[in-house]
């Protein structure tokens, strides 16, 4: 048990100028100037400009022949810089912690103080520079409208921890602004009103997003580290990494032993990625990663989709919200720990079954470990929310202006092949993406009934 106290300060200024001409051309300029106590004394302030340009092509004279069906066509382009503030408060300062060495004073051993963080007066903002182009459109009397955006974002001065010599440093590891990463992708949103009559209307929106990441660098002339790092470690007793973060490659790469079956001895059968040879599991495979480990897929969805529908009939309305993610794999951490006969507690019933359906069951000799068997296709499409409402007809009065009753359900159903509780994950740490943690509180179905009254 312990307690702590800390404080930090953030101050910012913002300015914006916009200009439009002839209802065709638009310019927006903005700048933010922010200062944070979390940065080093030499870099507490950051400036973040942005520029966006717009051209409404549909208002040009040469587009007059399209106005019977084209309501809006606008081309957009933008550039902007944003800054990221770290979560920890005192990364730029020397910090101390209680611990060894102990010293003997007047018959008692007393705990000493030790440095546990190097000062970094030059610590600065992580900055992301983004370029984007997009198009807005509307056709057929605004019955169909939407947008398409392409973006390219580069983040520099990302914080990473490095080994440093002692002395001159007080602590053998330090954080520094060195890393670089790239994100690029596409976002599409399409809206439509397929049906509209006096009593009935159906409005629908579909969204599509794809993002690709690439780690560009983790080293510079002053701070150097390996181009490959093993991350996303599982806890005891497995204590193994499940992913790699590698310069020149996308984030979220599953990396480990590829299992293809179970031997008659009840041990995993592992594929050698170089030769294709199938070998019975042994502990040396866990340390000889260069020989036995291989890429097992990615933890980050390639595609995110959404689909919302609103249907109105007289005083009734029905809203449906669908979401989906595709092109990724999930690590079922609970199965990695408990679908194994080496454990005597919380063992899953599936541990008594053959993982690959060939009659060979894992035996107690097979230690808990991470293999590809515990990765599952994470694709899903779910009805996230369903709401049915009714607007109560009211006689005109001075007390109540409107009244509506509704029933709503969240997390209604999910279409997926995933063998865990819920494929929609929300891990806060990007270095643990794709892990369905064994101690996660399960997603619940929620049902709500309500009454809204406007006075």
Describe the role of every protein-language-model region:
Residues 1-241, 374-455:
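Extracellular/periplasmic, surface-exposed regions of secreted and cell-surface proteins
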Residues 36, 325-412:
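Extracytoplasmic gating/loop element in the C-terminal half of outer-membrane beta-barrel translocons
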Residues 55, 123, 261, 266, ...:
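Tryptophan-centric aromatic hotspots in well-structured domains and transmembrane helices
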Residues 86-102, 221-229, 250, 257-258, ...:
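Membrane-proximal, glycine/serine-rich, low-complexity loop/turn segments characteristic
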Residues 113-115, 285-290, 363-371:
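Short glycine/proline-rich turn/loop motifs
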Residues 176-299, 312, 325-328, 334:
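Gram-negative outer-membrane beta-barrel transporters
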Residues 290-292, 303-304, 316, 367-373:
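Short, flexible active-site loops
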Residues 301-315, 384-389:
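Conserved SET/PR-domain catalytic core that frames the SAM/AdoMet-binding pocket
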């Amino acid at each position: 048990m312990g307690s702590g106290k800390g404080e930090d300060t953030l101050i910012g200024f913002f300015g914006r100028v916009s200009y439009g001409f002839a209802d065709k051309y638009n310019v927006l300029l903005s700048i933010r100037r922010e200062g944070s106590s979390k940065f080093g004394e030499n870099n507490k302030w950051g400036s973040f400009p942005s520029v966006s340009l717009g051209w409404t092509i549909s208002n040009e004279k040469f587009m007059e022949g399209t106005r019977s069906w084209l309501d809006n066509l606008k081309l957009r382009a933008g550039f902007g810089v944003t800054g990221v503030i770290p979560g920890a408060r005192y990364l730029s300062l020397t910090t101390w912690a209680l611990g060894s060495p102990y010293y003997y004073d007047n018959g008692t051993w007393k705990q000493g103080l030790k440095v546990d963080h190097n000062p970094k007066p030059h610590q600065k903002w992580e900055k992301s520079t983004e370029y984007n182009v997009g198009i807005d459109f509307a056709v057929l009397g605004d019955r169909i409208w939407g947008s398409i955006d392409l973006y390219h974002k580069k983040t520099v001065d990302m914080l990473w921890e490095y080994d440093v010599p002692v002395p001159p440093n007080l602590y053998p590891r330090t954080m520094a602004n060195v890393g670089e990463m790239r994100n690029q992708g596409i976002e599409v949103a399409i809206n439509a009103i397929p049906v509209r009559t006096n009593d009935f209307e159906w409005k629908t929106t579909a969204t599509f997003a794809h993002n690709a990441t690439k780690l560009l660098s983790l080293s510079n002339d002053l701070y150097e580290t390996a181009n490959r790092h093993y991350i996303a470690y599982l806890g005891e007793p497995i204590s193994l990494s499940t992913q790699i973060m590698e310069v020149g490659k996308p984030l979220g790469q599953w990396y480990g032993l590829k299992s293809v079956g179970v031997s008659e001895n009840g041990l995993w059968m592992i594929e050698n990625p170089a030769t294709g040879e199938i070998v019975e599991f042994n502990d040396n495979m866990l340390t000889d990663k260069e020989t036995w480990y291989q890429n097992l897929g990615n933890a980050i969805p390639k595609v995110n989709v959404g689909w919302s529908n609103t249907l109105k009939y007289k005083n009734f309305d029905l809203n449906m919200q669908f979401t989906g993610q595709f092109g990724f794999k999930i690590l079922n951490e609970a199965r990695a720990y408990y679908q194994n006969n080496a454990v005597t507690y919380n063992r899953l019933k599936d541990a008594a079954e053959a993982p690959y359906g060939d009659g060979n069951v894992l035996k107690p000799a097979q230690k808990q470990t991470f293999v590809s068997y515990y990765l599952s296709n994470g694709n899903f499409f779910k009805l996230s929310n369903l709401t049915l409402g009714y607007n109560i007809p009211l006689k005109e009065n001075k007390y109540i202006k409107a009244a509506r009753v509704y029933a709503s359900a969240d997390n209604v159903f999910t279409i997926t092949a995933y063998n865990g509780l819920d494929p929609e994950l929300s891990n806060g740490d990007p270095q643990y993406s794709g892990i369905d943690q064994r101690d996660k509180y399960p997603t619940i179905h929620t049902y709500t009934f309500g009454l809204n009254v406007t006075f």
